[in-house]
Regions:
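A compositional/structural signature for long, glycine/proline-rich flexible linkers
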Residues: 1-393
Length: 393
């Protein structure tokens, strides 16, 4: 007595169409199912699906009232069903021929019931509202459709004490559509230097394998905002998933309202300059000099232009540098080298601010992004030196 899988989940939450707040990645799609555990005690969920074709895929369970994650499972850790393989571990052309089963259960589920469960995400039994998110990165690019070429996983509710299946539980309204706890963002500071800091990630339905560095930018008329760093390696195939520095990395630009308008991801940036750096130039989409700026960027290896429409999106920009699934052996991991900036600092209270650990260039060296704002004419001049982008004064 269950609806079709696509009807069980909420509609596709797309990073690319300005319907999602909280600076989503444009190349990610999300789906959410939320139910009231308070009204349905002892009820867990069994998800059965086929592996979607994408760069990255995971499930995260949240306490919907706090928007904090309580458990998650990543693609490579999902044990496949009998006679299936996991295409994120073993290369195959046919992802969708392979099935998986995931259990989402309260912490008080009896051991006897757990004995036969392979993939378990649990939540504390004092959670009132349980939200399950499924995320896919680059599904459209890899499979041609946002679902990764397969149906959504089917949701079956069951009683964890008896094992008996029960009717589908009504999907409640998830807070991601309503009241996100967004920190105050102040874009009024107009310094030319653009330091990057690690985002405080316990907010707004964080994706646990992801880490973010951000810089707040006020882009004035006639200016370009620039930043550069040495990027991590990303995999070209499944066989490189275990050895690449990160599974995926991207740069996204979001507005003061926290919508995302521009993204570029690793595969779209095949080149670095002779020192191993990538350089980003954020230019006003309405600038008369845009063709000249683009020509100058194209003439320099590893330099990429991102356009920003100041007229429509305002002059406040949040630049986000995202790393997904950071390799434990990567020596330049932002997760290991940087401390998150305290929320108080976003509001201006700098008492808990430690620059050596909280400014990317100081904590991560050349691998930490650092930027500078120049006039368009300065950038276009023959004497422009890319090394000046990372100066702190």
């Amino acid at each position: 007595n269950n609806p079709e899988p696509k009807e069980q989940w909420g509609k596709t939450l797309r990073g690319d169409n300005q319907t999602l707040l909280a600076f989503p990645d444009i190349y990610a799609d999300y789906w959410e199912y939320t139910y009231s555990y308070k009204d349905n005690p002892n009820i867990g969920l069994r998800l059965t699906g086929k592996f979607p074709k994408s760069r990255f895929f995971n499930f995260t369970v949240y306490n919907d009232e706090t928007q904090i994650d309580v458990s998650s499972i990543e693609d490579v850790n999902i044990q496949p069903d009998d006679s299936s393989i996991n295409p994120y571990v073993k290369e195959t052309d046919d992802y969708g021929a392979n099935g998986y089963t995931i259990y989402i259960i309260p912490a008080n589920t009896p051991a006897s019931a757990r004995a036969s469960m392979k993939n378990v995400c649990e939540f504390p039994e004092d959670v009132n509202m349980v939200s399950i998110f499924m995320r896919l990165y680059l599904a459209k690019q890899y499979s041609g459709d946002e679902y990764g070429g397969v149906d959504m996983p089917a949701i079956q509710a069951f009683d964890v004490t008896t094992g008996e299946e029960v009717d589908f539980l009504k999907r409640e309204v998830c807070n991601i559509h309503e009241s996100l706890n967004l920190p105050p963002m102040d874009f009024s500071a107009d310094l030319p230097q653009l330091p990057f800091m690690r985002a405080p990630l316990s907010l707004m339905y964080p994706n646990s394998p992801a880490e973010y560095l951000f810089a707040r930018i006020k882009l004035n008329e006639g200016e370009v905002a620039t930043f550069r760093f040495i990027p991590p390696t990303a995999p070209k195939s499944v066989s490189e998933y275990a050895t690449a520095d990160v599974r995926y990395w991207s740069i996204c630009l979001g507005s003061a309202e926290t919508y995302s308008y521009a993204s570029i991801y690793d595969e779209e940036m095949p080149k670095v300059d002779k020192e191993g750096f990538v350089t980003f130039i954020i230019a006003d989409a309405n600038s008369a000099k845009l063709p000249d700026l683009q020509a100058k960027a194209e003439a320099n290896d590893g330099t990429y232009i991102l356009t920003w429409n100041r007229k429509e999106q305002g002059d406040g920009i949040l630049a986000l540098y995202r790393n997904m699934v950071i390799n434990e052996n990567y020596p330049h991991s932002m997760r290991k080298l940087m401390e998150s900036v305290p929320l108080a600092a976003a509001g201006g209270d700098m008492s808990g601010f430690n620059p050596m650990k909280m400014i990317a260039m100081l904590a991560m060296g050349n691998w930490g992004p650092q930027g500078y704002k120049f006039s368009e004419d300065d950038f276009l001049s023959d004497s422009f030196n890319y090394a000046n982008i990372r100066r702190m004064k």
